[in-house]
Structure formats: C-alpha cells, structure tokens
C-alpha cells in the first residue's frame, strides 16, 4: 500500500488541484488537518463549500482519510469546546474522518480530531483504548499536532507539540503517527519531518507555498518513507533504526517521476503584458 500524505494546505487551491492530479497513483490519501485557513480573506463558510467539493472529487479517485486541525474549527459544541462540525459531513463521501477507525489490509488507521478541551480529549482517549483492544499488525494514527519535545514539533525557539500525544504514544506504541501543524519543523536546524519515539515513527509534512505542496509518501509494504519539498527529496528506511540525516533520493521511483510530470495549468496561461 502506497499512501500520499499532505497537511496544512490552508485553502491553497493550486495545491488542492495538484492533489487531485496526484491522487490516482496512490492507494490512500491522508490529509493530516488544516484544509482551511482562518486568516484567509475568503469567507470561512465559502472555504468549507469549496473544500468539500474538492474532497468529493478526491474521494472518487482513491480512498481518503482526513483529520481536523486547528484552522478547521467552525463551531462550538454545546459544552463550549471548538469543533470542526463540517468535517463530520464528509463521512457521507466515504472519507474516514474525526473519530473514525478503519482497517485496510493489515493496517489499522485511527483518525483523531483536533481537541480543544477535556470532552474531545476524553473521546480520543476512549477511541485509542478501544482500537488498542483489537490492534492490527500495523496501527497508524492521524493527529494534526505532532508530539511535544520532538524535532517534528520544533519551531525554532520552542516546541509546539502535544504533550498528551507523547503520553498516548508511550502507552499504546502505534506503528506511526502522521501530523502537520508546525509548518517550519522540516526546514530549520534541529527540526525534522520524521522522528521515532520508542517503536513509533512520527511524521510532519511541513508547509511550503506554491505548487506542489510539500508531501510525504509512505510505502507501507516496502517499509520506506519519502519526503518531497521544493528544495529536497529524502527517504528513510522504516525497517532500520532512527538515523539522521535522511538519505537524499538519487534514483527516482516511478511514481515520483510521474508526479514530477504533473503540469501546472497556471504556466499554460501566462499573464498578458501590460500596455
């Protein structure tokens, strides 16, 4: 199984367009939160409508998992906690989202919501506890915030990760945790797109502007992870101990060659010269 991982697209429509073009080459697309952008000039309700349309098209191309991030919260629950109510609507599209668990082959996925208070946090704890009771060969969590005190949550001056997540990882030891949230971690000194806590691999895609987005490819069967940004292409062996730095990709896999050939439609329509 080959998985395409993105996060923090923040309503960048060129990046969503690229995602639609790339998706058919993968068995699963994992969107680790922050599809929307609370800082955008586009009305938040309009963003939700547009992103839902993209997700509907995406779900027609391959299987999709999406968890909420802090930019995706559109309402408060009756208890006063911020929630992404719209994310629950995409379940109708066949997309696994906040609070869902699904198994594909020998891999079990747990999709965690962004939590803003004790009630949602308690639901995540119950979700993990229930999934642990029927643990599959591989267990992968999708959780927008990376763990605290990890290179994947390093912001340059301090860590921005989730302390509770560190405790959950120590307790249940999943195979992988897929996150985003801390945009700069993979690009700065002492930060990284990958880490390992005990036996658990942790990933953070990071964020870059423009098209394509920065992304990770997980080849579950081969036990490899690839990270592709505008300025780097790296891979790690998930069957080996944690080693830094990651290995530069010198021989491109066929899927990477195909992704590089995705055309940017904006380049086909150059702006008219002023005059």
Positions of the model-derived regions?
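Core catalytic region of metal-dependent phosphoesterases/phosphodiesterases
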Residues: 11-103
């Amino acid at each position: 199984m080959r998985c395409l991982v993105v996060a923090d697209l923040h309503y960048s429509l060129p990046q969503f367009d690229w995602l639609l073009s790339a998706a058919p080459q993968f068995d699963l697309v994992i969107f680790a939160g922050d599809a929307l952008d609370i800082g955008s000039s586009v009305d938040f309700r309009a963003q939700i409508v547009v992103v839902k349309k993209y997700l509907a098209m995406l779900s027609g191309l391959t299987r999709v998992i999406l968890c909420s991030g802090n930019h995706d919260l559109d309402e408060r629950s009756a208890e006063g906690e911020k929630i992404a109510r719209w994310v629950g609507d995409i379940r109708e599209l066949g997309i696994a989202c906040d609070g869902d668990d699904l198994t594909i082959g020998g891999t079990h996925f747990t999709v965690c919501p962004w939590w803003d208070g004790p009630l949602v946090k308690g639901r995540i704890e119950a979700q993990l506890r229930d999934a642990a009771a029927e643990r599959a060969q591989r267990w992968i969590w999708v959780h927008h915030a990376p763990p605290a005190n990890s290179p994947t949550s390093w912001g340059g001056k301090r860590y921005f990760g989730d302390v509770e997540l560190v405790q959950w990882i120590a307790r249940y030891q999943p195979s992988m945790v897929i996150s985003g949230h801390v945009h700069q971690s993979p690009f700065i000194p002492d930060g990284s797109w990958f880490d390992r806590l005990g036996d658990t691999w942790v990933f953070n895609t990071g964020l870059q502007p423009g098209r394509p987005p920065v992304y990770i490819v997980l080849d579950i069967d081969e036990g490899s992870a690839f990270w592709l940004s505008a300025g780097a292409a790296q891979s790690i062996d998930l069957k080996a101990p944690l080693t830094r730095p990651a290995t530069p990709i010198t021989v491109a896999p066929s899927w990477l060659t195909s992704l590089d050939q995705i055309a940017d439609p904006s380049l086909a329509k150059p702006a008219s010269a002023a005059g």
